[in-house]
Amino acid sequence: MISKYLMVFFIIIIAACSSPNKILKSVNTRFPENPGKIQKLTKGVFWLSWLGKDTVLHRMESINALVINLESAPLTYDFSWFNDHRKTLSYVADSTLAVAAVNSGYFEYLNDGGYVSFHKSKGQVNQEVTIPENHVRFWKHQAAFVQNGEKNFAIIQGNQNVYKQLPIENIISSAPLLISDGVPMGKYFVNQKEGDKSNLPGEHPERHQAGFGPRMAFPTTPDRRLILLSVDGRSPSAQGINAEELTDLLYHHFKANQAINMDGGGSLTMFVRGATPTGVVNYPSDQRKINPDGFDHIGQRKIGMALLLIPKRKVLLRRMEKIKVTVDSLAMDYTDNPK
């Protein structure tokens, strides 16, 4: 009888495994003509990428994922804030010798209210939500990605009062919450059958979450993996994804039991040192403001916060120093109050 229960237990664990190779194989079922690529960056850290026709969504998609084994990866995680002097991700990642990095929370500062998100790093509050509760963007801080201990990450629901009282050193608020305790909430919170959302303000939650666009997500898995995932958009070669579809991708193929949507759009940037001249591996959408047909790795938006993966070991830091990172030739400033 004990053997029977043990067998069931191990079957469940194996089924929920989110190893990089299992993820690659699973997502490849959606890209039969253009299977993904996998590259080991350092111990416990893998970069996965797909570019081509997604046969589930029936659209062209560009997906990049950093899959991190929290138990074995020799990394420190820097919840970097530089919203007082915005920079490109590749500049910040290069100057800190990061092996990889992504943009993180919503950093905009609005003339009609101020900041839309909360940010705390190394125990210091860098940014507080100042927009009023009736503001169309108030929803953007209703969840948070937090680090509680060197290797422990969680995704929580809350508000600024909750975040300020938490005895946690690193917090980035964002929204929407996509998966909570194994429940794929992102599949249900927007009614896709209510018709065209174009009459709503661009940052209204229903329009934001129903629209196909560039998106960043931070999921975690039951087997102690952190995944940083980007899906490009606003191009015929990468047509974007909505919150429901993103939830489905993370839940079924990455086996995530927690996930949060982070800042996307033109801010979406993923950096892998040495992968391209600038380190950027996704296709920043702001470049198409200059060249409508542009589809390459330049045109980063200057952002105000990021999550940096920095090596602990001196030998890896020295290796990072030797990899040259070039300046983005088309870095874009962000307009906080677009018309």
Language-model regions, residue ranges each:
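Sec-dependent signal peptide recognition
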Residues: 3-9
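Hydrophobic h-region of N-terminal signal peptides that target proteins for export
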Residues: 10-19
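Zymogen propeptides
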Residues: 18-156
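Conserved beta-alpha junction segments in alpha/beta enzyme cores
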Residues: 51, 56, 177-223
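Structural recognition of the beta-strand scaffold that forms the well-ordered cores
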Residues: 99-103, 144-147, 153-155, 217-219, ...
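Conserved, well-ordered active-site substructure
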Residues: 111-139, 199-258, 267-319
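A substrate-binding/cap region within the structured catalytic cores of diverse enzymes
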Residues: 132, 136-195, 205
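Short S/T/G/P-enriched beta-strand
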Residues: 312-338
